[in-house]
C-alpha cells in the first residue's frame, strides 16, 4: 500500500496544520534537535525543528554529506541500505526527536535511532505523519515513544 504525502504538501493550510500538530506533540519533549531521514522526512522535519526551536540534522544516503560521517546499514524488503549523519552533529546527552513522513516496517526509523544512540544522544521520541499499522513498524522501535498523526490498519 503506497501512501503519498504530496497532496498534503500542495495545500498550504493542510501543511501548516500538519506542522502545528506535529509541533504540539513534540514541543513538550524539550528536544535539542530533530533528526530526519532522507528524503521525505526532510520536508516536514526541518519545519518541525524550526517551529519547536530545535536544530535539524539530516540523515542522508551514503556519500551525500561532505564531512566525516557515522553510518548504519539496515535491511529493506528488497536489500540493504544505509544512512549517515555528520560525526560531529550529535553531542553526547542531546535529546533527539526522530522524524519521518511514514512508519511502515520501521527499518529506516530504527536505523536513525541507532545512529543517534551510537553518538551518545538520547532518542526522546519518534514522530511520523502516517503509520501503516498492519506492517507493525512500532515493534522495531520498542523502547521508544512513537507518535503518528494518521494510522492505517492495525
Predicted regions, residues:
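PRPP-associated nucleotide enzymes
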Residues: 1-154
Amino acid at each position: 500500500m503506497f501512501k503519498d504525502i504530496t497532496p498534503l504538501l500542495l495545500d498550504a493550510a493542510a501543511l501548516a496544520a500538519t506542522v502545528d500538530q506535529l509541533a504540539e506533540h513534540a514541543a513538550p519533549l524539550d528536544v535539542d534537535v530533530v533528526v530526519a531521514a532522507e528524503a521525505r522526512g526532510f520536508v516536514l522535519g526541518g519545519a518541525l525543528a524550526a517551529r519547536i526551536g530545535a536544530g535539524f540534522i539530516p540523515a542522508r544516503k551514503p556519500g551525500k554529506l561532505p564531512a566525516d560521517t557515522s553510518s548504519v546499514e539496515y535491511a529493506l524488503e528488497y536489500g540493504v541500505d544505509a544512512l549517515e549523519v555528520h560525526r560531529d552533529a550529535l553531542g553526547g546527552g542531546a535529546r533527539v526527536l526522530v522524524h519521518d513522513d511514514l512508519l511502515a516496517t520501521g527499518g529506516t526509523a530504527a536505523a536513525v535511532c541507532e545512529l543517534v544512540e551510537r553518538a551518545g544522544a538520547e532518542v526522546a521520541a519518534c514522530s511520523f505523519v502516517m503509520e501503516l499499522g498492519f506492517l507493525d513498524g512500532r515493534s522495531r522501535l520498542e523502547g521508544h515513544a512513537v507518535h503518528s498523526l494518521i494510522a492505517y490498519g492495525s
